Structure formats: C-alpha cells, structure tokens
C-alpha cells in the first residue's frame, strides 16, 4: 500500500472512526484501525464488536492498493502533531506502516488485517431515506436516557411509533416516529449517530435494521450498532392523566431564571417552585453558601378552592434539560399534586419529571432517598412501570 494524503483529510477521517475503537484490554486487536487503499479512496474501519464505523476518504492519491491494521490512537496522535501538509503513507516489506511528512519519519508496527473483525453485510435495497427530523428527535429525547450501563434497557433510546428515553427520574417522548418497530438503540451509539448528523456535508442519510443491527449510512460513511436485546418498560402507564393545574411560561426567560437560581442550589440542583395566579417564585438554598430567589410572570390556572400558592420541589438541572430540548417561545407545565410528576409538552413532544419531596420544617428541598456523591436516588418511576 502506498498513498499520499493531506494531513487534515486523514485526521478528519480518524476523528470520525475513533468513537468505535475498542477499549477491551482482553481483545487488544480492537484498539486498531483498518486502512484499505482502493482506486481513489482510503477506507478507515474501527469496531468494538458492538459498534462499528467505516469512512471513505477521497481527497488523496493512491499509488498502490493494499490494507494494513495499526494502533488507532497512536496513529491519530502522530497525525495530530504533523504540520499541515501532505503525508506519504506506505507499508514496507515487513508490513510496517511508514509515514513521512517533510522531515519527520515514523514507523508503526502493525497486525495482520485479516484477523480484524469483518464488517456486517447488508443488501442495499433494505435501506430507506431519513430526514433531519430523525436527528432532531433523537437529540430531543437523548437527555433523559439513563447513563447507568447496568440498567441496559434504559441506557438507550426506544424507537417505535414514538421515540422514548427515561432514566427513572425524567422521561422524554416524541410522538411522531419513523415507523421503526420496537428498537432499543444503545445510548453510546445514539451519541455516535448524532455526531454524524452534525456534520453538515450535504450527505443524504439512509437507515435500516437487520439481524438486530441498526445501520446508518451516507455515500462515504457507514455506522452500525448492535441493538439491546431487552424490553423497554410500558411507559404509557406513568404518563400523568389527571393534572388539574396549568402554568404557561415564556421558555427562554424561565431557562435564564433557573440558571441563576441554580447557582445557589445544592449538589443535586434542588429548587423550590411557588406558583401564584400571575407569578412564579423560584428559590434555592445551600447550607454552605446561602440562598437565591427570583420572581417571574406566568399564567397559572389553579384549582377552584385554592387560596395558597402551589409549591413543588424540582431538580433544576433536569427541568433545564427539558426546556432546552423544546423549540417554542412558550411552554406549558401541567401539575397534579405535590407527589405526582409534572408534564411539559409542545406540539410533538411530551416530557415528564418526578418531583423532589419538600421538607416543611427546613428552608430547603430534600430528595426521598439519601444521595451520596453524584449517585442519583432510585425512583419508583421505573419501578412502577416494571411492576405492571
């Protein structure tokens, strides 16, 4: 193999495939990238067996074809430090990867490329086009997915007639799906998909699912990820249906107010929300720092016999995630009592957030479960779904 490629082009390709590089120490071969030179392209391929990425680079000169397998992160580190010019890459008679750029010379040891896992194959006619809405919807629900890999069925985004994600404390639902059927896409693969969608190169995306593997591709890019083999909880039963209190609030001013009041909140962003007929008072306090309070105008519909403010405790960071996932100028918050989740929605999405328990004897908000460090308390949100 012998090619000449611009340093920038090569580095961009390595950046694309780096997220699917294997980290398992028991399978060191997965820490490699496979380079394949054919005609006028250089193909880069990495996989950790669960996720794989292939990208074809075209802005280069292929002098002789071939393929090689080498340490991906070491190769990227070398390319990053080279000057912005052309890089000559070839294999020598021992199969080592030789790189030359101006006065720099590198020799990188390699492994037999035939030992690297092969790419899954799928027929072209199984793919169907997807629009930018697919990426928008994924982005709008991703925040609610559990970050705990041990809760594997929640460490994902559920794709069906709706897009759904939950971690037990909050839930995001997009009502307008793409006709997928009961797919659990791992969160780490969702993140890779969204990074691909952020690259504005004019490419048209296509997707398909085959043999429990989700594929996404463009002309020069192929992503694949193995789906989670499990069941997503029946989320419909925990959607509040009898909320009698409604607040209509300007979204951006609410975001700004939460960010300010959250500065004085505890480590779990506990905040108190007091709803009056025409105003909302946000407050927080920290035993070590002090407290904060802010009032803003809202349209609040209270219950008929209500003569006191309706007060609830919320995780400000979680509510902020919801508000930032919405697009409208105004947002509707539906509330029931001081124990039931709130519901926030717009035309296409529904977001649910558990409340924190208010401790009346203290000027602060505490969660129902003791929290140590950054570990979130278990919520009966998911327990209720899984029990039925």
Regions found by a protein language model. Name each.
Residues 1-388:
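Structural preference for solvent-exposed beta-strand-turn elements
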């Amino acid at each position: 193999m012998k090619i000449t490629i611009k340093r920038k082009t090569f580095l961009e390709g390595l950046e694309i495939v780096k997220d699917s590089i294997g980290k398992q120490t028991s399978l060191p071969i997965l820490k490699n990238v496979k380079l394949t030179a054919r005609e006028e392209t250089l193909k880069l391929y990495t996989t950790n067996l669960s996720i794989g990425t292939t990208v074809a680079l075209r802005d280069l000169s292929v002098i002789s074809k071939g393929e090689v397998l080498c340490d991906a992160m070491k190769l990227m580190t070398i390319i990053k430090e080279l000057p912005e010019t052309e890089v000559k890459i070839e294999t020598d008679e021992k199969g080592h990867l030789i790189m030359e750029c101006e006065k720099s010379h590198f020799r990188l040891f390699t492994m037999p490329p035939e030992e690297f896992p092969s790419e899954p194959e799928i027929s072209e006619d199984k793919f169907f086009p997807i629009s930018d809405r697919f990426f928008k919807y994924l982005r709008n629900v991703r925040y609610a997915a559990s970050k705990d890999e041990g809760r594997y069925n929640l460490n994902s985004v559920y794709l069906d007639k709706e897009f759904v994600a939950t971690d037990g404390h909050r839930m995001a639902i997009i009502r307008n799906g793409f006709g997928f059927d009961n797919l659990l896409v791992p969160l780490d693969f969702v993140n890779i998909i969204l990074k691909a969608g952020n690259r504005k190169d004019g490419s048209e995306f296509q997707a398909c699912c085959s043999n429990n593997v989700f594929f996404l591709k463009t002309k020069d890019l192929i992503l694949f990820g193995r789906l989670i083999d499990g069941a997503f909880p029946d989320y419909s039963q925990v959607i509040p249906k009898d909320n009698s209190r409604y607040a209509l609030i300007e979204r951006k001013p609410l975001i700004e107010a939460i960010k300010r009041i959250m500065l004085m909140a505890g480590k779990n962003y506990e905040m108190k929300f007091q709803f009056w007929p025409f105003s909302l008072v946000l407050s927080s306090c920290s035993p070590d720092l002090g407290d904060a309070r802010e009032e803003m105008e809202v349209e609040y519909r209270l219950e008929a016999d209500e003569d006191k403010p309706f007060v609830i405790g919320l995780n400000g960071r979680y509510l902020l995630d919801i508000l930032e996932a919405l697009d409208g100028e105004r947002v509707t918050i539906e509330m029931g009592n001081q124990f039931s989740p709130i519901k926030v929605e717009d035309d296409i999405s529904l977001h649910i957030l558990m409340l924190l328990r208010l401790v009346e004897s203290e000027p602060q908000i505490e969660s129902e479960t003791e929290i140590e460090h950054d570990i979130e308390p278990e919520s009966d949100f998911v327990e209720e779904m899984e029990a039925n």
